[in-house]
């Protein structure tokens, strides 16, 4: 049986105020990070050197956005976290509702209204050696801060992409559906892309088809139809990817999930990426080839606007009320 967290943490109330703290002080105090039931300052937030998340990249994570005092698609992110954990035989020592409340509490503790959450579950402290059965308990870490993945001008002018030599791992190695802490292939692909002068890299699968970028899903517009690589191609079923697919349907546009070659990206009328941190960002150039006119196209701009309107008006309230399943 999983033991509950020690009762050392008083979750901030739904009003946004933490018992015993002055709200004016809260807004100026250093970043507070949630680790296993307690809040720590950035300088005090530490995990053991024997944590298997550090030693072996053994754990799972989610990146989550919040806008205008609402967490966007919180339940979907938490569900995916638990699915990833189940896939790697990792028991999260809390319920979905408790993890949701930990997330909301961390935002309240930092008195934030717009930002980014990094939710991490490590295998926990164990011994040297791969066996996860030496780890007694998983650790839950929540960081609520801000993020700016790309400069604002890139959302107006578009990114530069390049194909990476590092391939997306095969399904028979570790499913791309698992958001694990082992992101080394993505890191190496990012290094390759930036070394070539690009800002993001396109990762292919073992068969040479387009999978995704190092941290984002890919969409192509051709003759008014929107295309995206299939999940079977090695792309993550991104939360933002799913949202954009909904927005495409609402806009009355046709959407197709297909296998894509680099040729399909080279000859696209429009190309854009989606991700929690990136949101929806246009692409201007890929492998030294201009995409369309070299500027964000009308469908891309429409979807960016629809996405921004959606995230500002929907989501789980942070301060108005506590999470209700």
Q: Which positions does each model-derived feature cover?
A:
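Conserved alpha/beta cores of soluble small-molecule-handling proteins
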Residues: 2-202, 206-209, 236, 246-325
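Glycine- and Gly-Pro-enriched alpha-helical subdomains that act as flexible
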Residues: 201-202, 209-232, 237
